Every structure is written in C-alpha cells, then in structure tokens.
Amino acid sequence: HNNLRVDLFSTELTTKSFLTQMESMSLDISDFFAWGYIRLFHCHLVEFKWTPDAMNDILERIITHVKFSNTDVAIIDSLTIFTEYTTNEAVLTFLTQAKNICDQGKTILITMHSYAFTDEVLTRVRSICDAHLLLMRKLMGDKYVMVLEVVKVRGARKTTGNLVSFEVHPGYGMKIIPVSVAKV
C-alpha cells in the first residue's frame, strides 16, 4: 500500500456501514482504517440545517482540508446533495479548486449524479475534470450488471473497448463480465 493515505467524505455512509460494505466485497480494510491510512468523514449530520450558506461552508471546509492535509487521495461521495442547496457557481468553484489541488500532486475522486445538473452546467463540470467515468446499470439477459464507461481521461488516447461490465457478489467481490458475454 506504500503508506498511501485516503480521506473519504461521505454523505451516504457511516463508518460502520462503510467497513461492512467493503467487507461484503471481500475487501477487508479495517486494519488500514484502524491505523489511520483511511479516514472517513461523515457529511450527513442529524438535525443539520441544509441551507445555501451551510453548504458553501461545508464545500469550503472540505477543499481546505484536502489542500492542507497529508492525504494522498480524497474521495467525495457524493457531491450531488450539495448541488441541491448551493449555486452552480459554488459547485464549479469547488471543482476548479479541486483541480488546482490535483495539479499539485493529490488525487481527488468525486462522485455525482448527472441528473443534479442542467446540460449546460454538466458540460462545464466535464470540462473542468481530468477524467469522466460513467457508471450505469444495464439489463443483460435476465440480470442486471454494472457497466463502467470511460468517457474522458485527459492526456489519454481514445481507444475502442472503453466499457467494463461487472457484477458485485457479496462475499466474493467484483466479477468482470467478458466483453463477448456482455455484448450478447
């Protein structure tokens, strides 16, 4: 693991649910969590007043923490809830600040739902980001599988076959579905 440090800001998971979910995919990260290599910051607070000012403050606190912490990777899951209570400009400013931090050597992964943005804002969001991965749920035969599409990776050549299909099996982990099977 080379002593990589990861901070996860989650609006959806508590510490217990995060560790349980990882363990259910045969990814036991409890030691990394216990030693502080992975830290979880739960952003969904009980009795918190969701207002534009509060959201802007949280976004500013997150970006300041990432900028000045000793973390190598920051994961924000999910930015969607913030878009409901703040302006598009605040979200775009947050993403621009995140990109500037990435240019200094840190990695920041942000999940968001595309339905939270207008097409115009979504185009601006995509232009700021270095990579854009689209996760979809597709029906293949009689079961649903997850499909990950690499839409954009800055600096990479566009290649064919930029789709990965997989299933998540509790207790086993992720099972990649071969392209020949996925296309049937």
Please report, for each region that a protein language model flagged, where it lies by residue.
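Conserved catalytic network of the ASCE P-loop NTPase/AAA+ motor domain
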Residues: 1-2, 30-33, 64-69, 100-105, ...
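Conserved P-loop
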Residues: 1-46
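Loop/turn-to-beta-strand initiation segments
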Residues: 5, 36-37, 70-73, 104-112
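Short, ordered loop/turn segments at secondary-structure junctions
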Residues: 11-14, 45, 78-81, 113-115, ...
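Alpha-helical scaffold elements adjacent to nucleotide-binding pockets in ATP/GTP-utilizing enzyme cores
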Residues: 17, 21-22, 94-97, 124-128, ...
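NTP-binding/hydrolysis catalytic cores, primarily Walker-type P-loop NTPases
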Residues: 69, 163-184
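Phosphate-binding/switch region of NTP-binding enzymes
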Residues: 112-173
